């Protein structure tokens, strides 16, 4: 949580989804955060990680692992090497890709970590 520029991949527009909760909690805590939701393009939410107009330091994966692997591969091409993988978004393929490409991947819950901040 030491980095300020985040992208959350998942259903950031659906109030009942964890991606939405993480996206909004990061904003509340003062982080620069955008959403990545394939098929969606609106304020602060991008169809593709390549469309984000500034450098992302951390990618938070809160999406189906099959879609997540594609996003991780794109992130790697852009030089993003820090990924937080939420429970349910992990897969052996994602973990192996991260290892093979020197990406610092951590499995954990952003909401739990954010709740520790004052």
What do these predicted regions represent?
Residues 14-16, 20-43:
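NAD(P)-binding Rossmann-fold cofactor-contacting core
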Residues 31, 80, 103:
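Short phosphate-binding/catalytic loops that engage adenosine nucleotides
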Residues 35, 85, 105-108:
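General beta-strand structural signal in soluble alpha/beta enzymes
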Residues 40-71:
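Glycine-rich, highly charged phosphate/nucleotide-binding loops
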Residues 53-55, 91-115:
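Short acidic, glycine/proline-enriched helix-loop-strand junctions
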Residues 75-98:
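ADP-ribose/adenylate-binding Rossmann-like module
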């Amino acid at each position: 949580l030491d980095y300020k520029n985040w992208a959350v991949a998942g259903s950031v527009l659906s109030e009942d989804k964890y991606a939405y909760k993480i996206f909004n909690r990061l904003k509340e805590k003062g982080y620069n955060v955008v959403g990545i939701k394939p098929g969606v393009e609106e304020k602060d939410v991008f169809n593709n990680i390549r469309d984000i107009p500034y450098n992302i330091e951390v990618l938070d994966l809160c999406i189906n692992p099959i879609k997540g692997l594609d996003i991780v591969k794109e992130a790697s091409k852009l030089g993003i090497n820090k990924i937080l993988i939420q429970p349910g978004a992990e897969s052996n393929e994602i973990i192996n890709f991260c290892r093979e490409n020197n990406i610092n991947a951590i499995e954990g819950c952003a909401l739990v970590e954010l709740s520790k901040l004052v």
